[in-house]
Amino acid sequence: HISANIMQLHHSKHHATYVNNLNVAEQKLAEAVAKGDVTAEIALQPAIKFNGGGHINHSIFWTNLSPNGGGAPTGDLQKAIETDFGSFTKLQEKMSAVSVAVQGSGWGWLGYDKETGRLRIAACANQDPLQATTGLIPLLGIDV
């Protein structure tokens, strides 16, 4: 269970700030491109990565939530979890361990590896987006 206060904070403060700051950075980038100012374009990349990543990560996070959520998955996802981790409980344990090990701010992720056709667990620092950082397709994110 995640409290309403935590969800409100994540939506109204964190996610909204990432979107607003990304919009500002994209506007500055457009101006730099129009001027041919490559130095400014390069200088804006960290802000675009951080705020764009925060927007992407939180957008995925919202899709992972449900008022009636919880419990083990069924169907193809259940089969993939059992194949790649042994059981849903083992997946939970590994996800928790990887997420807790993140130093400072970051994300624990369950992702799909298109090259191997397998599920993998990964962590990303700060707001680094999973797919851009690891190539994995994000399925479930834990904000830490």
UniProtKB/Swiss-Prot annotation:
Domain of life: Eukaryota
Cofactor(s) required for function per UniProt: Mn(2+)
MF-aspect GO terms: manganese ion binding; superoxide dismutase activity
Binding annotation for Mn(2+): 10, 58, 143
Record bears the keyword Ligase: no
GO cellular component labels: mitochondrial matrix
InterPro entries linked: Fe/Mn_Superoxide_Dismutase (IPR050265), Mn/Fe_SOD (IPR001189), Mn/Fe_SOD_C (IPR019832), Mn/Fe_SOD_N (IPR019831), Mn/Fe_SOD_N_sf (IPR036324), SOD_C_sf (IPR036314)
Compartments, as annotated in UniProt: Mitochondrion matrix
The protein's Enzyme Commission number: 1.15.1.1
Stored Gene3D superfamilies: Fe,Mn superoxide dismutase (SOD) domain, Iron/manganese superoxide dismutase, C-terminal domain
Cofactor: how bound: Binds 1 Mn(2+) ion per subunit.
Quaternary context: Homotetramer.
Family to which the UniProt record says this protein belongs: Belongs to the iron/manganese superoxide dismutase family.
Biological role: Destroys superoxide anion radicals which are normally produced within the cells and which are toxic to biological systems.
Name of this chain's protein: Superoxide dismutase [Mn], mitochondrial
Species annotation: Petromyzon marinus
Lineage per the UniProt record: Eukaryota, Metazoa, Chordata, Craniata, Vertebrata
